Amino acid sequence: MTDKLYLDADRLLNDSFRLADQVYRSGFEPTFIMALWRGGAPIGLAVQEYFAYREIETDHILVRTSYYHGIDNQSREVQIYGLNYLVKNLQAEDRVLIVDDVYDTGRTIISIIESMQDRLKLNMPQQVRVAVP
């Protein structure tokens, strides 16, 4: 079993701003920020606020995923809720930043991107990046 690291609110906020700064300094300027509910929500908020401070306009949305059924039990398929707004508004030239609190197996992110590709077709943005602190 791995040890868990628990962050207080100040550390999470500071780490979130550092993450946003790394994305900004990489030259990537998202037009959409997708934060994953629940853990990614406060991080996504800080990232969006950072870009607003830099006068970079971004649209932002929370997307919920689920595949856990009780402690240590996972279903095979990731359920994704809240992509409809993105399907209606994204264009191929958009730049999407997916923000979450942890990157474990990559299953959730892969499922989201595959679902976006399936639903958006030719409107699927060519530039999709993932950011976690």
Where do the protein language model's features map onto the residues?
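PRPP-associated nucleotide enzymes
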Residues: M1-P133
